[in-house]
Regions:
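Cysteine-centered catalytic environments shared across enzyme families
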Residues: 1-346, 355, 547-558, 581-596
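Soluble or luminal CAZymes and related metallo-dependent hydrolases
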Residues: 250, 350-354, 487, 491, ...
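Adenosyl-5′-phosphate
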Residues: 1-4, 10, 23-24, 43, ...
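Short low-complexity, flexible loop/linker segments enriched in glycine and/or proline
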Residues: 339-343, 385-388, 569-571
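Donor nucleotide-sugar recognition loop
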Residues: 347-351, 536
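Conserved S/T- and glycine-rich ATP-binding loop of Class I adenylate-forming
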Residues: 272, 373, 495
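Active-site adenylate/phosphate-handling loop in enzymes that bind or generate adenylated species
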Residues: 145, 157, 357-420, 503-523
């Protein structure tokens, strides 16, 4: 886990790489890699790669980056982990390839030399990289299928710039004028949807895409793995396993993914809550003779309530004989940390506060890598959206023209005193399709509220550039399976743009790597056909098979989610925002968000 950056002066009129700029951008990401720093420049000075290192695999100096191939033709700056790198290395060695390190980075260089970008299909892990192919004179970028690791770029028509963070790129000469799609997207969703950012000059490389830049400039990004497509394929080819066999199949896949995510040359701990997902992970890593390091986050406001996860988590930790710690966070902690948190936030978001505090605690305990249960709700259909969204569409289909009728009713509802809550007012209008129902379920501010916040013209421009309805429809194209449709939407929109991004910036600000066994492409491909055939399989059934030491109290505990007492924290006399997530979002936005 690291921070990377690159500059490619591809146009003949562009000046050579400004080495000072490359190092400034690199060192803006110091927290992502406190263990080392490096830079590489092509002999002609037209290409530069930078790297900040958090040493997890092959922690020796041999694993330092940027890394150059033995023949000098390839150079790479890589952020992430390749969990199957040992198997890939063994295959390459059988082909006669020789290695100078024990790192997964060197495996990427050899894989590219043998297969080109087709190598991406072989990778199991979380990754973003910039690779210079000196022979073909092209810079290649790529991201993992889910978008666990971020990658941003800026292209001014002469030079192409890359970095792991938006704020790092802004240390260089990029267009910082406001991007309507970014601002509208933030208030619409509570996070900025890919590929947009808050500034016009910077874009995200979308998850599951790669991009090539040569002397003629940047080509269009190429989709090499589409999560919506994986789920669509499963919907059209469901498993033939009987229900009992299917449960055991998924349980085995979960165990395999958790164990794969333990590959490291440093200890790997785990976040532990009273939820099934993290409990499963902790149970699986607590093998005989091994005591896992576990950490629970609690909140003073939740003590003694149904949202207090600490007692059940501590009970499971004792059962697993784990080295366990519980951190209790109070409102004053939030007040004390708020400005640091906002400074670290790479793009505006209403989330990430919980990860900030638990990651800070893990780092202070000396951990470098931890496992998290993030992604389980999207995979195992645990959110209310999995029944609410299809139900709304079923109701809408009973009417002949729900959208125009709903739009009329919404306008009438606005005249009531008091007016209906926005989502209630939009129920009929947004019941036309799974995509529109999902938007209503997940939106922070409804689309018709945005002009009052941003101005009519700016809001309209942002909505047009986002083209959200068509983008949502593409996510579930070819998929008519209700459970897998909602999984595709949750994974591609909420999880990718909010949970994964917030998990990255909030943990990397503490120099901590978070690994996600339930956000794994191999696991998804094994599980999705099973859920297509047996959509009624419950998470508790899977956990009982995969992790038998979990108590019935955890297995059957009502879902609360990894939540924070945001209403209590944002209620006066706390300075700054008002109460609730919408006020928190407006507070962030009204600070005239400065990505620098």
């Amino acid at each position: 886990m690291c921070g990377l950056n690159a500059i490619y002066a591809y146009h003949p009129s562009a000046p050579p790489v400004d080495r000072g700029e490359l190092l400034r951008v690199r060192d803006r990401m110091r927290a992502r890699g406190p263990d080392g720093e490096g830079a590489w420049y092509s002999p002609d000075g037209r290409v530069g790669l930078g790297h900040r290192r958090l040493a997890i695999i092959d922690i020796s100096e041999r694993g330092a980056q940027p890394m150059v191939s033995a023949d000098g033709k390839l150079a790479i700056s890589f952020n992430g982990e390749i969990y199957n790198y040992r198997q890939l290395r063994a295959d390459l060695e059988r082909q006669g390839r020789t290695f100078n390190t024990d790192s997964d980075t060197e495996v990427l260089l050899h894989l590219y030399a043998t297969k080109g970008m087709a190598m991406l299909a072989d990778l199991r892990g979380m990754f973003a990289f910039a690779l210079w192919d000196g022979e073909r004179r092209r810079l290649l970028l790529a991201r993992d299928p889910f978008g666990i690791k971020p990658l941003y770029y800026a292209d001014d028509g002469r030079s192409f710039r890359v970095a792991s963070q938006v704020k790092a790129l802004l240390c260089g000469p990029v267009d910082t004028s406001p991007e309507p799609a970014g601002e509208v997207g933030f208030l619409l969703w509570g996070s900025v949807p890919e590929p947009w950012t808050m500034v016009r000059g910077i874009r995200a490389l979308s998850a599951g895409h790669w991009l090539a830049v040569d002397a003629s400039g940047a080509a269009a990004p190429v989709a090499w793995c589409d999560i919506g497509g994986v789920l669509s394929a499963a919907a059209n080819a469901p498993s033939t396993l009987a229900r009992g066999e299917a449960i055991h199949c998924v349980a085995a896949a979960i165990q395999d993914s958790v164990r794969a995510h333990l590959v490291a040359d440093v200890p790997v701990g785990a976040f532990l809550s009273a939820g099934i997902d993290s409990a499963m992970i902790a149970d699986i890593i607590a093998a005989p003779g091994l005591r896992p390091y576990t950490l629970t986050l609690g909140f003073a406001e939740y003590a003694g309530t149904a949202n207090d996860e600490a007692p059940l988590a501590e009970e499971l930790a004792r059962r697993l004989d784990a080295w366990h710690s519980t951190l209790i966070v109070r409102r004053q902690d939030f007040e004390d940390e708020r400005e640091k948190l906002l400074a670290a936030m790479d793009q505006p978001s209403i989330d990430g506060v919980n990860t900030w505090f638990v990651a800070r605690a893990a780092a202070r305990m000396g951990m470098k890598a931890v496992l998290s249960g993030l992604g389980g709700d999207e995979l195992f259909a645990s959110y209310p959206s999995f029944h609410q969204v299809p139900r709304l569409v079923r109701y809408g289909r009973r009417l002949r023209h729900p959208k125009p009728l709903g739009r009329w009713l919404r306008r009438v509802a606005a005249l009531l005193s008091p007016p209906l809550p926005p989502k209630a007012a939009g129920l009929l209008e947004y019941s036309e399709s799974i995509g529109s129902a999902y938007l209503l379920r997940r939106c922070l501010y409804a689309p018709w509220e945005l002009p009052a916040l941003l101005g009519e013209d700016f809001a309209r421009a942002g909505l047009e550039r986002l083209a959200t309805p068509s983008a949502l429809a593409r996510t579930i194209a070819g998929n008519d399976h209700a459970r897998l449709q909602v999984s595709a939407l949750e994974m591609t929109w909420y999880m990718r743009n909010q949970l994964l991004r917030d998990s990255d910036w909030a943990s990397m600000a503490q120099s901590l790597e978070i690994r996600l066994p339930l956000v794994d492409i191999d696991l998804l491909r094994r599980c999705a056909p099973v859920f297509a055939a047996h959509p009624d399989i419950r998470k508790a059934e899977l956990a009982a098979s995969a992790a038998p030491r979990i108590s019935p109290q955890i297995l059957h505990r009502p879902k609360t989610g990894f939540s924070i007492p945001v209403r209590e924290w944002l209620r006066p006399p706390a300075s700054g925002p008002g109460r609730g997530l919408r006020d928190w979002a407006r507070f962030i936005h009204q600070r005239q968000w400065n990505a620098a």
